[in-house]
């Protein structure tokens, strides 16, 4: 039984409309039904830092890319220390809807140097499994129209396209494992589970 082992940190990445939230939540449901301790979490988290950024954006009509990057890094550190690490220490499989690679993609899309983004996130722990939900841009846009977002500020079309390009570069660098998310949800879930279980199998040896 997995509960006797150290936890597993899995992140689900992709542009808005790729199905991250749906897949992440369904993965947790599926893992729980199989007897694993699993928990869903997300970024930006509901930390004082993300709330401050939201207020800043509301007040000034936007945020400088450097301020945005630093606020997200603070939010991430809070998320790791207060949520992710405690769950991992209790042996949970933690499924995070977005993580560090969202900063690389979305703040990188605003022209921030990627090395600097990595630098200010140097205390962000390495995920065990990082999955990228790959979906054609037009399908993502169509899906995005069907739901309301708390962070629509990040979702203008030009920025999303640039973010998608950066995600694809991260795949080439072997930072992310790509999964075709244009298929039926069950097919996507099954492939993600196979990736997770493949990692668990290797870790046992």
Which role does the model predict for each range below?
Residues 15:
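P-loop (Walker A) phosphate-binding loop of NTP-binding proteins
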Residues 5-9:
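Pre-Walker A (Motif I) flank of P-loop NTPase domains
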Residues 12:
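Hydrophobic anchor at the beta1->P-loop junction of P-loop NTPases
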Residues 18:
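ATP-binding Walker
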Residues 21:
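Walker A/P-loop
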Residues 2-3, 26-28, 138-205:
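NTP-dependent small-molecule kinase module
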Residues 98, 103-165:
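A glycine- and Lys/Arg-enriched "phosphate-lid" helix/loop adjacent to the NTP-binding pocket
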Residues 36-122:
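ATP-dependent small-molecule kinase phosphotransfer cores
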């Amino acid at each position: 039984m997995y509960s006797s082992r150290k936890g597993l940190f899995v992140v689900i990445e992709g542009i808005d409309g790729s199905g991250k939230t749906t897949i992440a939540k369904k993965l947790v449901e599926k893992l729980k039904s199989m007897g694993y301790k699993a928990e869903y979490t997300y970024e930006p988290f509901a930390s004082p830092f993300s709330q401050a950024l939201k207020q800043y954006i509301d007040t000034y009509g936007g945020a400088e890319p450097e301020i945005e990057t630093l606020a997200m890094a603070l939010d991430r550190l809070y998320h790791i220390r207060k949520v992710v690490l405690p769950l991992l220490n209790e042996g949970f499989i933690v499924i995070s809807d977005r993580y560090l690679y969202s900063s690389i993609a979305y703040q990188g899309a605003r022209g921030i140097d990627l090395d600097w983004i990595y630098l200010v996130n140097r205390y962000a722990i390495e995920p065990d499994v990082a999955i990228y939900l790959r979906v054609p841009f037009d399908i993502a846009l169509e899906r995005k129209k069907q739901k309301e977002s708390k962070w629509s500020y990040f979702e203008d079309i030009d920025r999303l396209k640039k973010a998608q390009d950066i995600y694809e570069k991260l795949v080439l660098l072997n930072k992310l494992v790509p999964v075709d998310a244009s298929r039926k949800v069950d097919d996507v879930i099954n492939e993600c589970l196979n990736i997770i279980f493949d990692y668990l199998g290797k870790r046992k040896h």
